[in-house]
């Protein structure tokens, strides 16, 4: 079966569709249509508008989705997903990136792109997706001593499989390939210019992807991937490539944040107050760890930043929370005005 090569398992087959329909998997998403692979081949399909009219953007098909397709090449429904990667837009709307993958490969290069704060953000959405995160550090040929990078990674990604690779010499690929399960679906996350396209070519053993050079002055690259697309490799792995994303908003699920910052979460259990904000309360275990140096200040500040961002998106998506926030600020402003009126004049 063609679809078995594309990751079709009993999990999806047990989701029944109409007898006149076919199972398919979305292999690429364009503005007005989708590329779908079925047992009858690959073709471009459109949505049956009436079936998706009232659904939010997060319920529309994404690359990796298994779908129900009609004989008229229309997508009738999206099957239940096993994993999902999405990001929050500036308008606090969820934008779907990919679905039904086994591994989330976070690709960073060992030049100016190496950024622990960004890595923590990627790890948060990777854990949140339900897939297994793997860190891929490209351009390993540029570094003589990898020890400092390894030590930094252990502070934010302890236990996450990490591979230093060189696309030119194929260094590191043998170990990675040995650890990936056969016929797995991999989604690649990372900024532009980190070598994702070259990485795919190295993993595939063929020039599947167009590559571009990066500027030497700031290590920034051009977008060689302009849309989300799936590739079936000869060795059986399925790769979902995504356009470079240097910045993106995290979603509303707390689980990914708790896993990425598990050290902070564990410390918070020892705080004196159960509702401790970990800023200035007495008996705060998090603040005590900051004071004695066992907790990194940068790690803590990034945790706070992502907490605030998640709370912001939650308020934007919940009228009740938004109203509570407005009421809270009204109370603060009222107290401030009362204080200014009653304070002694100089």
Swiss-Prot record:
Which keywords belong to this entry?
Cytoplasm, GTP-binding, Hydrolase, Metal-binding, Nucleotide-binding, Ribosome biogenesis, RNA-binding, rRNA-binding, Zinc
Instruction: Name the positions where Zn(2+) binds.
Output: 271, 276, 278, 284
Which segments constitute the CP-type G domain? 93-248
GO molecular function terms listed in the Swiss-Prot or TrEMBL record = GTP binding; GTPase activity; metal ion binding; rRNA binding
SUPFAM superfamilies recorded for this chain?
P-loop containing nucleoside triphosphate hydrolases (SSF52540)
Cofactors per UniProt? Zn(2+)
Subcellular localization, per the record?
Answer: Cytoplasm
Q: Which positions bind GTP?
A: 138-141, 190-198
What is one process in the GO biological process aspect for this record? ribosomal small subunit biogenesis
Superkingdom, according to UniProt? Bacteria
> Which Pfam families did the record assign?
RsgA_GTPase (PF03193)
How, per the record, is the cofactor bound? Binds 1 zinc ion per subunit.
Query: What are the record's GO terms for cellular component?
Result: cytoplasm
According to UniProt, the name of this protein is Small ribosomal subunit biogenesis GTPase RsgA 1
Give the organism the record lists. Listeria innocua serovar 6a (strain ATCC BAA-680 / CLIP 11262)
């Amino acid at each position: 079966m063609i679809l078995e090569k594309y990751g079709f398992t009993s999990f999806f087959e047990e989701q029944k569709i109409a007898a006149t329909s076919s199972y398919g998997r979305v292999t690429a998403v364009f503005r007005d249509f989708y590329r779908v692979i079925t047992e009858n081949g690959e073709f471009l399909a459109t949505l049956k508008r009436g079936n998706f009219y009232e659904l939010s953007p997060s319920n529309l098909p994404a690359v990796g989705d298994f779908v129900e397709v009609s004989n008229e090449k229309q997508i009738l429904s999206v099957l239940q997903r096993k994993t999902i990667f999405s990001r929050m837009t500036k308008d606090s709307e969820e934008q779907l990136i990919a679905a039904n993958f086994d591994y989330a490969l976070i690709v960073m290069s060992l030049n100016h792109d190496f950024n622990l704060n960004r890595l923590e953000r990627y790890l948060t959405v990777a854990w949140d997706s339900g897939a297994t995160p793997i860190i891929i550090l490209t351009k390993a040929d540029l570094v003589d001593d990898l020890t400092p990078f390894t030590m930094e990674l252990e502070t934010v990604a302890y236990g996450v499989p990490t591979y230093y690779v060189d696309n030119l010499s194929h260094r590191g690929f043998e170990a990675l390939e040995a650890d990936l399960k056969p016929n797995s679906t991999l989604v690649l996350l990372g900024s532009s210019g980190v070598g994702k396209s070259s990485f795919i070519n190295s993993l595939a053993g063929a020039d599947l992807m167009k590559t571009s050079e990066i500027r030497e002055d700031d290590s920034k690259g051009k977008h060689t991937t302009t849309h989300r697309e799936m590739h079936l490799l000869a060795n059986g792995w399925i790769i979902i490539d995504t356009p470079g994303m240097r910045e993106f908003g995290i979603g509303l699920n707390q689980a990914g944040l708790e896993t990425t910052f598990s050290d902070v979460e564990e410390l918070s259990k020892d705080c004196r107050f159960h509702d401790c904000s970990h800023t200035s309360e007495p008996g705060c275990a998090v603040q005590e760890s900051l004071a004695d140096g066992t907790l990194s200040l940068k790690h803590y500040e990034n945790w706070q930043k992502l907490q605030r961002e998640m709370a912001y998106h939650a308020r934007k998506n919940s009228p009740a929370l938004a109203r509570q926030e407005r009421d809270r600020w009204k109370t603060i402003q009222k107290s401030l005005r009362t204080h200014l009126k009653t304070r002694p004049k100089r």
